[in-house]
């Protein structure tokens, strides 16, 4: 199954993000927009992993971060990744990431013991849309878009499955790892 590891964001972030998506749609941008229930900060995309292996990985990851102190990061700002001269992905920025980066490194080290390697640099962000089409002079149309700072408390991460459909991905929580409470298995 197609899997990834993520941190959920709070309702305030989801609400503000939805307002930005609405503005972008009204301004003529077309994208596969991320629904509120699917908004998250991806730590790792693992790809296809069989059920038995993901169970083992979840147990080891959770053991690795047991007792990790809870922390927060700030969601702030709006931006995009480009392909050539075109917007490819719209995202919300993430600041105050020292503890987030420590968590990322702990998980990355554990995942390396399970045969995973991650070559791309981790750039924390929250994807809100994968751009399909955009209007002329699109850069002018997003100059005034910003995201006010919102703090997100973190005391756990989740492992999700992702099923791709014509209307967008369907995410399902498989495991939740609470820093103080241990592993919770869904499914």
Curated annotation (Swiss-Prot):
Pfam families: 2_5_RNA_ligase2 (PF13563). GO terms for molecular function: 2',3'-cyclic-nucleotide 3'-phosphodiesterase activity; protein kinase A regulatory subunit binding; RNA 2',3'-cyclic 3'-phosphodiesterase activity. Keywords: Hydrolase. Gene3D superfamilies: Cyclic phosphodiesterase (3.90.1140.10). It catalyses: a 3'-end 2',3'-cyclophospho-ribonucleotide-RNA + H2O = a 3'-end 2'-phospho-ribonucleotide-RNA + H(+). InterPro entries: Cyclic_Pdiesterase, RNA_CPDase. A motif (HXTX 2) lies at residues 125-128. The keyword Ligase does not apply. GO terms for cellular component: cytosol. It comes from the Bacteria. SUPFAM superfamilies: LigT-like. Its EC number is 3.1.4.58. The keyword Hydrolase applies. A motif (HXTX 1) lies at residues 40-43. The active site is at 40 (proton donor), 125 (proton acceptor). Hydrolyzes RNA 2',3'-cyclic phosphodiester to an RNA 2'-phosphomonoester. Belongs to the 2H phosphoesterase superfamily. ThpR family. This is RNA 2',3'-cyclic phosphodiesterase. It comes from Thermotoga maritima (strain ATCC 43589 / DSM 3109 / JCM 10099 / NBRC 100826 / MSB8).
């Amino acid at each position: 199954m197609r899997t990834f590891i993520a941190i959920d964001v709070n309702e305030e972030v989801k609400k503000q993000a939805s307002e930005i998506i609405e503005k972008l749609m009204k301004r003529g941008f077309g994208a596969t927009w991320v629904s509120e229930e699917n908004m998250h900060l991806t730590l790792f995309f693992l790809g296809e992993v069989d059920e038995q292996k993901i169970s083992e990985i979840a147990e080891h990851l959770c053991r690795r971060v047991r007792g990790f102190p809870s922390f927060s990061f700030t969601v702030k700002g709006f931006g995009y990744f480009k392909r050539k001269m075109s917007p490819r992905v719209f995202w919300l920025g993430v600041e105050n990431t020292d503890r987030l980066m420590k968590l990322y490194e702990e998980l990355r080290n554990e995942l390396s013991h399970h045969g995973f390697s991650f070559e791309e640099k981790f750039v924390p962000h929250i994807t809100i849309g994968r751009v399909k089409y955009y209007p002329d002079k699109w850069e002018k149309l997003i100059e005034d878009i910003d995201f006010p700072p919102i703090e997100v408390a973190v005391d756990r991460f989740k492992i999700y499955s992702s099923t791709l459909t014509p209307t967008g991905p369907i995410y399902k929580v498989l495991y939740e790892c609470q820093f103080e409470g241990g592993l919770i298995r869904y499914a």
